[in-house]
């Protein structure tokens, strides 16, 4: 009998509407994404970048540790030996469609040449635009150098 009266007076609907009205006047939890951005952790792993030294020389010494440690095999490196006996890369490609953003390349690098930056907005309509060559990676490093330095400084205590 009680169940019949509850269904007759639409008890469930009234209960649902009171719950809706209760949350209607509370502050919103969601973020209006393109116009508002949530804070990003200093340990966030985003778009890759190659860094340079202060004198403008690239940091990568072509040890190929990042290529060896990459579980997705997204990194391809070719190198040449210079006149002074050191090696530098002639080709450094990362296929961002294969990358799983694990950060192992960054951890394996002995000179902090390859890092994952704060940028996560790099969507593209074509597959070829997501295959980053050395120039694109160096451009990202130059563009994000200050933020990358701050990020590495904050993360240094955990390394």
From Swiss-Prot:
One of its GO terms (molecular function) is NADH:ubiquinone reductase (non-electrogenic) activity. SUPFAM superfamilies: 4Fe-4S ferredoxins. Binds 2 [4Fe-4S] clusters per subunit. GO terms for biological process: aerobic respiration. One of its GO terms (cellular component) is plasma membrane. [4Fe-4S] cluster 2 binds at residues 70, 99, 102, 105. The keyword Endoplasmic reticulum does not apply. Its EC number is 7.1.1.-. Keywords: 4Fe-4S, Cell inner membrane, Cell membrane, Iron, Iron-sulfur, Membrane, Metal-binding, NAD, Quinone, Repeat, Translocase, Ubiquinone. Pfam families: Fer4_7 (PF12838). Residues 51-80, 90-119 form the 4Fe-4S ferredoxin-type domain. NDH-1 is composed of 14 different subunits. Subunits NuoA, H, J, K, L, M, N constitute the membrane sector of the complex. Belongs to the complex I 23 kDa subunit family. This is NADH-quinone oxidoreductase subunit I. It comes from Rickettsia typhi (strain ATCC VR-144 / Wilmington).
